[in-house]
């Protein structure tokens, strides 16, 4: 090897190692960003069971917006994902009552602080219940929601474990986030209401 060839070869090795280093940095940054986004902003969740039918179906996957825990506020009617007793169990329900509110159900009508609240997302379920000659939601309450807690129910009121039975009132720190979008199955992608 001549002296003229030697520097070119060293430059080539140096260029290759720089290229590998640049690619490595880009991959590390991309993975770190993906982990941060998943932990703090958005995460996919699987719907298990029929408690939110017909709004959500068993086996659907939805994106959960976790940013409501840091900025914004959870609103009545939002679909929320709730941590269960173990890290592998999550519940998907609809937020009905907020801290300080009084929740009551009479004759299939929701009342918050004595004021009638429309629930348009229940229209098809109420129609089916009426055909069967039953109320979709049994009467209950009034229930005063304490500070730091939320009252939730599934849309499939005849088949839902929620704040009325089993789950109880939900502590604010158990709410993972809200969902506004189903992304799987792909042929049925949609916003949730």
From Swiss-Prot:
GO biological process, one term: signal peptide processing
Topological relation to the membrane, as annotated: Single-pass type II membrane protein
GO molecular function, one term: serine-type endopeptidase activity
Known catalytic reactions: Cleavage of hydrophobic, N-terminal signal or leader sequences from secreted and periplasmic proteins
Enzyme category, top tier: hydrolase
Keywords from the named record: Cell membrane, Hydrolase, Membrane, Protease, Transmembrane, Transmembrane helix
PROSITE patterns the UniProt entry points to: SPASE_I_1, SPASE_I_2, SPASE_I_3
Keyword ATP-binding: no
Family: Belongs to the peptidase S26 family.
Name this polypeptide is given: Signal peptidase I
Provenance organism: Bacillus amyloliquefaciens
Taxonomic lineage from the root: Bacteria, Bacillati, Bacillota, Bacilli, Bacillales
Gene of this entry: sipS2
């Amino acid at each position: 090897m001549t002296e003229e060839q030697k520097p070119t070869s060293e430059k080539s090795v140096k260029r290759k190692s720089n290229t590998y280093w640049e690619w490595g940095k880009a991959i590390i940054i991309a993975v770190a960003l993906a982990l941060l986004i998943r932990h703090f902003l958005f995460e996919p969740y699987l719907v298990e069971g029929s408690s939110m039918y017909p709004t959500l179906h068993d086996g659907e996957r939805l994106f959960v917006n976790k940013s409501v825990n840091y900025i914004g506020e959870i609103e009545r009617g939002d679909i929320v994902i709730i941590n269960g007793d173990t890290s592998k169990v999550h519940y998907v329900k609809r937020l009905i009552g907020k801290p300080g509110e009084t929740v009551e159900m009479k004759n299939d009508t929701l009342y918050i602080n004595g004021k009638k609240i429309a629930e348009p997302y229940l229209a098809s379920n109420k129609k089916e219940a009426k055909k069967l000659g039953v109320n979709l939601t049994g009467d209950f309450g009034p229930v005063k929601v304490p500070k730091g807690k939320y009252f939730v129910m599934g849309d499939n009121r005849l088949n839902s474990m929620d704040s009325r039975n089993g789950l109880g009132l939900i502590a604010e720190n158990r709410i993972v986030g809200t969902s506004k979008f189903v992304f799987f199955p792909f042929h049925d992608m949609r916003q949730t209401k």
